[in-house]
Amino acid sequence: MPIGVPKVPFRNPGEEDAVWVDVYNRLHRERLLFLGQEVDSEISNQIVGLMVYLSIEDDTRDLYLFINSPGGWVIPGIAIYDTMQFVLPDVHTICMGLAASMGSFILVGGEITKRLAFPHARVMIHQPASSFYEAQARDFILEAEELLKLRETLTKVYVQRTGNPLWVISEDMERDVFMSATEAQAHGIVDLVAIENENTGNSI
């Protein structure tokens, strides 16, 4: 039997009685957002909508986007990235577990100096791919041209936001490049790596 989303009590300001809301609803009220699945149109629209709403609600408080994603569709990922640059609050990105493919693209899109990885997180970058075998010859050519444009877009963003030269990013995107948290920091994808407290096991 699947476990449902846990519910937690929440009291609106000025109200005496608390109401029960699901835990993600509660976290969203604290401006904490989660990308914990493949990137597709549904989750992209949810995150974009939340960022826009929370920006309208209060454009002075930062947003925090936690990422544990194997990647996914390019265009929905770009939609999240563009919205992060559009909203007025700074968006912190936090990698926990894995930020691969479009997950790493969204990770690097956080406010520079406010991108963090947990100590055992993994990051992977590569070029966009497509299922060419499903396409007819004409569609194959058109799709290949579109992929080249998307690759150019992603490469430019990585260059801009990591500080690496174009040739370094271009070489990295030729294959799957996995990195530890510290390697991702050295590569400019994140700015900080959380430090584990040796006494308590908690991260600080």
UniProtKB/Swiss-Prot annotation:
Q: Which family does it belong to?
A: Belongs to the peptidase S14 family.
Indicate where this protein resides in the cell. Plastid, Chloroplast stroma
**Highest taxon listed in the record's lineage:** Eukaryota
EC number(s) on file: 3.4.21.92
Oligomeric form and interacting partners: Component of the chloroplastic Clp protease core complex.
Question: What is the purpose of this protein?
Answer: Cleaves peptides in various proteins in a process that requires ATP hydrolysis. Has a chymotrypsin-like activity. Plays a major role in the degradation of misfolded proteins.
Which GO terms label this protein's molecular function in UniProt? ATP-dependent peptidase activity; ATPase binding; serine-type endopeptidase activity
Q: Which reaction does it catalyse?
A: Hydrolysis of proteins to small peptides in the presence of ATP and magnesium. alpha-casein is the usual test substrate. In the absence of ATP, only oligopeptides shorter than five residues are hydrolyzed (such as succinyl-Leu-Tyr-|-NHMec, and Leu-Tyr-Leu-|-Tyr-Trp, in which cleavage of the -Tyr-|-Leu- and -Tyr-|-Trp bonds also occurs)
Please give a single GO biological process term from the UniProt record: protein quality control for misfolded or incompletely synthesized proteins
Gene designation per UniProt: clpP
GO CC terms, sorted: chloroplast stroma; endopeptidase Clp complex
Q: What is this protein called?
A: ATP-dependent Clp protease proteolytic subunit
- State the active site: 101, 126
The record's section on Pfam families has: CLP_protease
Q: Which PANTHER family match?
A: ATP-DEPENDENT CLP PROTEASE PROTEOLYTIC SUBUNIT (PTHR10381), CHLOROPLASTIC ATP-DEPENDENT CLP PROTEASE PROTEOLYTIC SUBUNIT 1 (PTHR10381:SF15)
Q: Which keywords accompany this UniProt record?
A: Chloroplast, Hydrolase, Plastid, Protease, Serine protease
Q: Where mainly located?
A: plastid
What is this enzyme's class at the first EC digit? hydrolase
Q: Which InterPro entries match?
A: ClpP, ClpP/crotonase-like_dom_sf, ClpP/TepA, ClpP_His_AS, ClpP_Ser_AS
